């Protein structure tokens, strides 16, 4: 694998879809950190601006998230009633639990 391929695998991305009820499902993949969180925020902001009652973050493809990623999730939580984290890795689960955010960022079993 060359350096470019490796970089493409780690760059974070966000894809916005909607469930049958019209609520946003945001698929995060790669790494979410301070180097890309502003671009990811800009990509998901139109869905959040619609003030949905709930947002699901599908985290199955997420390989890394630092505190700026948690801050992004909290910003979304402030704009909605419910934020659910689907397929969160053990690392993300530990971060959410250790910071006492399980009431704000709900982890799906």
Report the location of each language-model feature.
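STAS-typified acidic loop motif
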Residues: 3-42
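Short, charged, intrinsically disordered terminal tails
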Residues: 5-10, 98-109
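Amphipathic alpha-helical interaction surfaces in cytosolic regulatory modules
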Residues: 31-105
């Amino acid at each position: 694998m060359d350096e470019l391929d490796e970089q493409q695998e780690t760059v974070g991305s966000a894809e916005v879809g909607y469930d049958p009820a019209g609520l946003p499902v945001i698929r995060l993949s790669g790494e979410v950190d301070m180097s890309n969180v502003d671009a990811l925020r800009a990509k998901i902001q139109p869905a959040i601006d619609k003030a949905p009652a709930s947002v699901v973050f599908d985290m199955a493809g997420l390989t890394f998230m630092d505190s700026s990623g948690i801050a992004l999730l909290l910003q979304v939580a402030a704009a909605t009633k419910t934020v659910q984290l689907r397929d969160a890795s053990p690392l993300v689960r530990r971060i959410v639990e250790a910071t006492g955010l399980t009431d704000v960022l709900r982890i799906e079993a």
